[in-house]
């Protein structure tokens, strides 16, 4: 993943090419921490909003994942989910994802980081973490990945049937 440091935020966003983004790179702890920091910078955030909105309008639609997608980026999306799980489950899932690369990682440190990020994201002035009023709450604490996806697909299918 290219880092466009030193650029004006608008110029850096214009140079981004989503075709070059490696999805696996987006799921790292470093990107997770950086995303929260970047999201609190008004100038960077404003530049990213338009980029994300344009991405969402691609032919065929798009599925976007983020803490302000339903409230700021795509407030008029046909279907929105507010996906959550208990802190313990979120940390365990993250641990499973990251422990292969980081042998010093602990569940306790991940819970602490999750709490800190959630608090920072809820309290930030720019695009705070909120559940959109019309978002479907999807608590995945007791659900497998397959069950979570099936529930989301079922909800989307119902919404499509109702809109046609």
Model features per residue range: what roles?
Residues 1-61, 88, 100, 111-122, ...:
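ATP-dependent small-molecule kinase phosphotransfer cores
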Residues 8, 105-109, 130:
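Alpha-helix N-cap and coil->helix boundary residues
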Residues 26, 50-51, 95-101, 120, ...:
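NTP-dependent small-molecule kinase module
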